[in-house]
């Protein structure tokens, strides 16, 4: 009974000894077979058991794992939080200073809108110049203006380029060039713009920067200086551009000149008329009756001279008129009319302006000449013989606005038979023949010939004939140009646009496109067997040249036509 119990207890105890590994169990056991205790079982090797014993401290419950994780977080968080707080503090402490400095710089560099737009135009100009250089295209105004408008979303004109050149004249170089226009197949003028960054003097600080950035800073600094010098917001002046692009604005001082002229006119209007004109003339009342009795001798007193006042002043004058400074001579007599008013007839009569106050030169001359024959009266003069009728008795004639007539004709106009007229002195009369008689014969004939040619040029038929002769005289030269051109390109059919373009581009003395087209029409008219025109399906006009025609024959034909046109002039 004991043996089986002991045998059963041995394996149990051996397990505990192996697991616990305590020395008390070794002293208590009295098993004579130690091999069963010392050797481990093959299912559970010793290394695995030792590793399990080492890992037993790690294998904890879920609660302990959570506590261990929490302790680790608490141990790690202060370091990270302190680092993060330091970084945040540094960034928060540095950002206000940076913001303040950036705000100050922005405030310093802030300009009014129109000056700011000019600065943007300059930056876009610099960028467009760089782009055109990378693309290999010429920096002409037509090329860079499109890029500037795309970058700034504003229209870039010649005036903006002139303003930029005024701010930075030494760095911007502008010259006139001729470029080929693909639409018109002609050469047209354009502006070639270049930026010379080496021509500008920089500060010591800006030498370390690139030339492009330094040039922009210099432009902006000069623009700011201009704004400070003109606080009222004046426009930036425009530098003159090469012709025909020099389209300057009207003079800004024109308004000042207009104001000055208007103020002068106001001053002239404020001056009394008595100071401006020294000879006021009193007007006589206009007759309103169909017939008026002649005044008696007691009613009329003739003054001896206009400067010498009469014994008694005039009793009644209807109005005083100050006449503008014209060559009218004052009347040498002054009449006194009684205070009794004239008898007004019941029939209405239209009153007319006195002829002596008309502004026509003929009228003024007539009244001045009519005023001459009146002489001072003496005691033997009969008052009834003196005509005291107002000037309305003169015949009213229609005033002509044609001033082309000679002064001799004007002197004979608008006089009545009842008023004697003094003859004008002969020394006042001057004619063209008398003036020309002083000149030499050759010069006189040359002047008359020029006058005759000027009259002929006014005739459209004569001017057209002269132009035709001039065109025909140039046809032999044009024939040689076209003949050599066709021989060089080896083409007998060419568009008219291309032909005209090649003629103008190859010869600097030929510049008028219209003149070349007229000469081509004359060539087709005179030598139709050599040149003709056809219209293609696309709508272009084709010029066809007959290669079988002899050049000598055509050239002689053109010279003969030229001689026929010049024959009437030689004869």
UniProtKB/Swiss-Prot annotation:
Q: Name one GO biological process term.
A: DNA replication
Cysteine disulfide links = none
The protein's matches in SMART domains, at most eight in alphabetical order, are given as: CDT1
Induction conditions: Repressed by abscisic acid (ABA) and ABAP1. Degraded by the proteasome.
Q: Where is this region: Disordered?
A: 1-110, 288-315
What Gene Ontology cellular-component terms does the record carry?
chloroplast; nucleus
Q: In which tissues is it expressed?
A: Expressed in proliferating (e.g. shoot and root apical meristems, organ primordia) and endoreplicating cells (e.g. guard cells and stomatal lineage, developing trichomes).
Ordered alphabetically, the record's keywords are: Cell cycle, Chloroplast, DNA replication, Phosphoprotein, Plastid, Transit peptide
A GO molecular function assigned to this protein is: cyclin-dependent protein serine/threonine kinase activity
Localization annotation: Plastid, Chloroplast
Primary site of residence: plastid
Transit peptide (first-last residue) = 1-79
Start-end of Polar residues biased regions:
22-38, 288-302
Quaternary structure (record): Binds to ARC6.
The family note in this entry says: Belongs to the Cdt1 family.
User: What does this protein do, in the record's words?
Assistant: Member of the pre-replication complex. Component of the plastid division machinery. Promotes polyloidization and regulates endoreduplication. Involved in the coordination of cell and plastid division.
Protein name, please? CDT1-like protein a, chloroplastic
Give the source species: Arabidopsis thaliana (Mouse-ear cress)
State which gene encodes it. Answer: CDT1A
